[in-house]
Amino acid sequence: MQPVELAEALASFDEVFAPRIVGYYNGNKIQVAKAHGEFVWHSHADTDDLFLVLKGRLIIELRDGVVELGPGQLCVVPRGVEHRPRADEETHILLIEPVGEPNTGDSSERAAAPEVELET
């Protein structure tokens, strides 16, 4: 068992909205991702969506409002709530989702990213 260096993990790729798995916890994948620009509107029917900002600012647009997050802040979007993450600058985030859950909530969505593990 070794600690995971999140900054090193994030430095190992450039793609945005393409999470990388850095570990597993009770059937969930722990992921890091970079955000810049707008992601697609989506929801997750069977699971909540957790966003923890490590660096930068993340804006989570909801149909009835906006949540703005800075470093060290997190937000849990409840299952079934439509949302769209966006970032006006490169932002680093940590995500926790069940294994097999697409980042778009729907694997047929063209923006759905494959599950990619980083070597830790």
Residue ranges and their predicted role:
Residues 6-41, 47:
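A short glycine-rich, His/Asp/Glu-containing loop-to-beta-strand
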Residues 63-79:
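Short acidic-glycine-tyrosine-enriched beta hairpin
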Residues 34-35, 43-62:
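Short, conserved beta-strand element in jelly-roll/cupin
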Residues 26, 54-55, 70-71, 89:
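A cytosolic small-molecule/anion-sensing beta-strand core signal
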Residues 62-63, 71, 87, 105:
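Short glycine-/acidic-enriched loop or helix-start segments at secondary-structure transitions
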Residues 42, 60-61, 77, 82-88, ...:
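Short beta-strand His + acidic residue motifs that chelate non-heme Fe in jelly-roll/DSBH
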Residues 27-29, 36-38, 57-59, 66, ...:
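Short, charged/polar surface micro-motifs in flexible loops or helix N-caps
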Residues 2-10, 23, 88-120:
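Double-stranded beta-helix
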